[in-house]
A protein has these predicted regions:
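Catalytic core of pol beta-like nucleotidyltransferases
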Residues: 1-19, 27-33, 42-94
Length: 94
């Protein structure tokens, strides 16, 4: 999984994300072998999002990706859960 996470981080950087966070069961460590990969993406330009998703889908894995682009006005409880359980895979240097 570590190699997959490195590839996801590289894609996030390539597509202009400010931050990529793994959340959900894989971040908590209570996942099953076939659990999807939940990703929260911060600050990615809208024009890059579809290509990011397609590039993730092209990675050599049978796992499914659930990609959420974080925007203003999202459910604060959802955002708090990401903050509580999330594992940062990539953060842009300021």
């Amino acid at each position: 999984m570590e190699e997959l996470y490195k590839q996801l981080a590289a894609l996030a950087r390539q597509h202009g994300a400010r931050r990529l966070v793994l959340f959900g069961s894989r971040a908590r460590g209570d996942n099953r072998y076939n659990s999807d990969v939940d990703l929260a993406v911060y600050g990615m330009p809208e024009g890059n999002r579809a290509n990011f998703w397609m590039d993730c889908e092209d990675l050599p894995t049978l796992l499914n990706f659930d990609i959420v682009h974080i925007t203003d006005g999202m459910n604060p409880v959802f955002i708090e859960n990401i903050k509580k359980d999330g594992v940062t895979l990539y953060a842009a240097e300021d």
